[in-house]
Each structure stands twice: as structure tokens, then as C-alpha cells.
Amino acid sequence: MLERYKTILEGGTGEITEKKSRFIASVRLVESEEEALAFIEETKKKYWDARHNCYVYSVGLNREYTRCSDDGEPSGTAGRPMLDVILGEDLYNVAVVVTRYFGGILLGTGGLVRAYSKAVQEGLKNSKIIEKQFGITLEVTTDYTGIGRIQYIAGERKIPVLDSEYTDKVVMKLLVPAEEEGAVRKAITEGTNGRAKLQKERELYFAVLNGEVHLFDQ
């Protein structure tokens, strides 16, 4: 299991032109090989009149399903360079299709490699990329004297507070990276002189993008 990994939150498209040939990159999050293949077929139907629809996908946190295709371009000039970009960006669970409308001018081997690589980079630039972290939700129950200390610890460690409930006591739900669980438990226990009750609720992946918290099962 990866403690952290980069993936797509929202796919995008990017387009470049090289010697009158148009290269359109379509990017999508995929969490199974079936999803990847369906996306490829969907894109081929959308751009049915294009000369080439080259693709790459990498599915699984151990890259169990990683494939690429030149789709009629000279061997090694499209799919492999596209895969190199994905691996270089360290992205998981992603599929990219680069559609080429031929402009009548041959690009040569080096030109094709550069064009397909650049198209993928452009597509990724127009996508929302996140880093998912493996973590837990930690329920913290305390009296009112402990609130300030817990809020300070959460703020100092940049730990999101998902929910707070105020009755005769305070119940806060914290989103804690798994690698920091022990340190956070210790800090809260010491900071409240042992008055806070800590309960681990669930394990999950999460990401924070532009201050917004996103929760995931995987």
C-alpha cells in the first residue's frame, strides 16, 4: 500500500500544433483496466475521423495494468513517450489518449516523440492533479478546557477538522495522515493532560486541493 500517490482529480484536455498536425490530449482518472479501455474507445469514437488515437494508461498502485499503443505511428514514437511522461510525473490510475489530425507534413521520429510528449504534458497541465494520502479519521472527545489546545495542535500540523459538535462536551473529528497518527495522539494526550478521549474511526485516502478536503476509499 502506498502512503501517498499522485493521481487525477479531474481530467482535462490539451492541444498543440506541430507542422500543421493537431495533437489533442484527453486525460481521465481510471480505477480499473475496464474503465481505461472504455475511455479509449469513447475517445476514438469522438475523434473517429482522426489519423491516430494513441494511448497510455497505468492502473493500480503497483501499476498492475500499464499499457501503451502507437496506433499506427512508427514503433516507439507515441505510446512509449506518452508513458514516459506519466511515469516521470509519478501518476497513478490515469489514462491519456492523444489524437492526431495529420497536417500533411512528416515530423520524423524525433518530432513525433516530442509532439506526443508535449501533448500529454499540455493535457496534464489542464487537469486537476492531487496527491492522495493514506490516513484516518480520529474522533477526539474533550471538555471545554481542551478545545484551544487541540485546535492549536491541528493548526500547527495542518490537520483538517472535519466536524465539531458542542454539547456538554466537545467532539471533534480530525483527518490525520496515518504516518502522523502516533505523534498526534501523543500531542493531544499531553496537551490535554490525558483528559481527551481518542477513538480511531476509519481508514481512508484524502487530498487537500486549494483548501478543500476530498475523501476517497482508495
Predicted regions and their residues:
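C-terminal regulatory domains involved in ligand/effector binding and gene-expression control
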Residues: 1-77, 199-209, 213-218
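Structural motif
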Residues: 26, 53-55, 93-96, 137-139, ...
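A common structural junction motif
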Residues: 47-50, 157-162, 189-197
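Active-site beta-strand/loop microenvironment that shapes enzyme catalytic pockets
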Residues: 78-126
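Short glycine-/aliphatic-rich beta-strand segments at the starts of folded cytosolic domains
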Residues: 128-144
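Short amphipathic alpha-helix segments
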Residues: 141-159
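Short amphipathic alpha-helices in soluble, non-transmembrane regions
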Residues: 150-155, 183-192
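Terminal, non-globular segments
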Residues: 174-183
